[in-house]
Amino acid sequence: ILYEENGVDVVDEVFFGWSVMWEDEGEWIEVWTHYGYRGWMERNLIEEKSREWMEEREKAGNTYVVTRGFADVMRGARVQSRMLETLGRGCFVEKMEETENGYCRVKLANGISGFVPEVALRKRLDSDRFLWGKSEERFFVEQGIPEGWSEEKFRRKVVECAKGYLGCQYRWGGKAADGIDCSGVVFMVYLMNGVLIWRDADIREGY
């Protein structure tokens, strides 16, 4: 969860595997998200990685996003196996080559490795590049829809994705399947389809 500087008021939500950057150290730190949003969070919730790690992850192209409301990470490739973690829609994982019984092995940013159903994942389409090129004022404006997609296909995918949030409760600042706000829905359905927009419901220069 991201907060205002007071650490009380919620402003946004980031998910497992998402990248952020920060400059100052402390118990609470201000972070920049990969979509240009700022907020405060507890330092101990962040798994520290290098810029080189982020760039290598981008280059490798094996980052996948959870598309189901929730997906359990299991020790083995079967439903009876021990559950290691539960991920929500929007979380990023590294997909490995190993597959078995309709499951695929994934690696999480904290180093945990386990199996999730292959049907719960889709290749990530958005990018972290803003974080190592924050001075690029037109980064978000110049985004395009995924290569090979028509505008009609993109619009259809956005609508289909939005339907996945039907029945979710309202939660201020939320972007998850168990609680989401109005601008959070719009942000997430665009992110899931490869386009990063401003997180809040207002006109923002540069987006």
Where are these regions (language model features)?
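Short, conserved micro-motifs enriched in small and acidic residues
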Residues: V11, L84, A176-I180
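Catalytic cysteine-centered active-site loop
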Residues: Y170-G184, M188-Y207
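N-terminal ordered "arm"
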Residues: G7-V8, A120
